[in-house]
């Protein structure tokens, strides 16, 4: 059975507000990703951490809470972020159908990354990791229950460090933009209009 966890408990430090609760086209931002995921996994197979149940102090805690709240029948879980509201049904279906135990959407880097010490990195050898991401639910839960991972920002890293499993990278479109700063709503509006025109 397929299940979904929506992460909607963030404090919005960089946005200076709880961005998941912002009203965008007459609807709270978090509802977009929630409704899209719901349309795929169905009633009873999705938990909105921060809405249906309280979230944790960190992303890691919120993911653990979400995993524990899902039905035991869920064997593959997709983790969706409220701050990426324009995820499509097709993208969620693609991840859930992928048999790999750790799957993630990626985009090629468009800017050249640099370490704080001034060391440059070849962007052609790197990806920008995005969400949603999908996992073997039992494996991810076991990794977190090991107690080795307290403050992770990405579950593919948990799977890699615990099982030595490299994620399956799936290149995707730019619609998985993450709302982070106040000015990002203008970019989101552009993506929203583009998706509306495609329908």
Task: Indicate residue ranges for each PLM-predicted region.
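Residue-level signal for inorganic ion chemistry
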Residues: 6, 30, 66, 81, ...
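Glycine-rich beta-strand-to-loop/alpha-helix junction loops that act as flexible
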Residues: 8-11, 56, 182
